[in-house]
């Protein structure tokens, strides 16, 4: 069941389900609990899962100011949510934006993190590349000015994206279904704001992470394999797996859940 909590200037939608060790699942940019339902339900077979819609995503109320989308803000939201539900310590797992948010909390409050799983990182702690920042900004502006159809049209103008969608047309349908779960102005602001924010900022030190870390790299334009490899090198003792990209969603989810379960069992 969805609950809502006001944390300063934003309100988050969240839920807790399943049974077993406590695990926090953090979705990626442009996703939400509904979009990650298969992952959340799979994890809930082995863990007590706290999942939430990040600020401005999904059922969380809109946040339309792009300046309010930073990793410092996302981390503050997550720490506030954990305080509210009374979780002092848990396994942290997340994809892309969610993985970077979880890693930031692991640097800010290391005692809170029992184990850390970073899936499909987009960078090794830096903001996105200038090209990706531009592409995300143009995508956000397309949503603002022309809605979802304009956004799809812009995506298809990017050669790498057009090739990927041509090889798997179902991905385009899934993306459209994902986007319509959000307030358009809110997700446009998120697409512009987050890529320009760096998870690893001055004052933070990856060496402060005390939890065991597993890195699951991606293998696409936004989440290049090299980024995952760089993250694994950056964090002392981190374990690196092979990417799951290129397989059907059902198989990808099954592999992700099994990999997380096995890693947590080991630590």
Placement of each model-derived feature along the sequence:
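Active-site loop/oxyanion-hole signature of alpha/beta-hydrolase fold enzymes
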Residues: 41, 50-93
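Flexible "cap/lid" loop of the alpha/beta hydrolase fold
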Residues: 103, 107-108, 112-145
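Conserved alpha/beta-hydrolase "acid-adjacent" motif
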Residues: 221-227
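Short beta-strand/loop motif that positions the catalytic acidic residue
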Residues: 209, 215-217
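Gly/Ala-rich beta-loop-alpha elbow adjacent to hydrolase catalytic centers
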Residues: 94-98, 102
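Conserved alpha/beta-hydrolase catalytic His-Asp/Glu region
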Residues: 127-129, 145-196
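Conserved HGGG/HGGXW glycine-rich cap/lid loop of the alpha/beta-hydrolase fold
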Residues: 7-62
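Catalytic active-site module of serine/aspartate enzymes centered on a nucleophile-bearing elbow/loop
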Residues: 237-267
């Amino acid at each position: 069941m969805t609950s809502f909590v006001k944390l300063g200037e934003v309100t988050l939608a969240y839920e807790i389900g399943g049974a077993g060790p406590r695990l926090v699942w953090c979705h990626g940019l442009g996703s939400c609990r509904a979009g990650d339902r298969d992952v959340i339900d799979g994890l809930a077979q082995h863990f007590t899962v706290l999942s939430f819609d990040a600020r401005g995503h999904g059922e969380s109320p809109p946040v339309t100011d792009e300046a309010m989308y930073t990793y410092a803000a996302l981390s503050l939201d997550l720490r506030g949510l954990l305080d509210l539900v009374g979780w002092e310590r848990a396994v942290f797992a997340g994809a892309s934006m969610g993985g970077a948010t979880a890693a930031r909390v692991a640097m800010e409050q290391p005692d809170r993190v029992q184990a850390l799983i970073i899936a499909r990182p987009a960078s090794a702690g830096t903001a996105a590349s200038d090209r990706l920042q531009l592409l995300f900004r143009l995508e956000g502006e397309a949503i603002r000015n022309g809605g979802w159809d304009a956004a799809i049209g812009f995506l298809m103008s990017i050669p790498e994206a057009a090739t990927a969608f041509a090889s798997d047309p179902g991905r385009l349908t899934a993306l459209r279904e994902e986007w319509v779960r959000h307030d358009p102005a809110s997700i446009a602001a998120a697409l512009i704001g987050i890529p320009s924010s760096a998870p690893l900022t001055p004052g933070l030190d990856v060496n402060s992470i005390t939890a065991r870390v597993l890195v699951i790299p991606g293998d696409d334009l936004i989440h290049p394999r090299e980024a995952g490899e760089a993250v694994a090198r950056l964090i002392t003792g981190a374990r690196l797996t092979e990417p799951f990209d290129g397989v059907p969603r059902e198989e990808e989810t099954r592999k992700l859940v099994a990999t997380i379960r096995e890693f947590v069992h080991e630590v």
